């Protein structure tokens, strides 16, 4: 619960009664958006908390230690029920795999991953899609390529606009406008 008196609570009777385990504010950042709790399928004392960062408890949720991951804004976690050392973490940067219980993670730089909030097409031929990405820049991507695939070298940054809106000037497809949270216009 994200509140002044919030925390992590546990019920062992289907919600009839609750015990407050922790009031650590670090583990409850933006709970309405992405805080999720995961229990190890083989050890009930191991609890994972995902929010901005990843947190791990080995004492049933009373204390937590931060776990380093390749990217922030962690949204989801899959724990292999037969081998809890094997996990997949979904975050704003993509997906990261661990084979050692979160001690290390695979890179996010080996996969074309983007989380787009807004897109717009321009009048260029062939048309290009302009988009604002979560935790990254605004980008312009061609709709096709003569190289057999659309490569990153075919794409262009068109400003910085995490999750803001984007528009392309109708009479000049080389000009785009993007809005960054906080009212900054690029």
Predicted regions and their residues:
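Beta-propeller blade termini and top-face loops
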Residues: 1-186
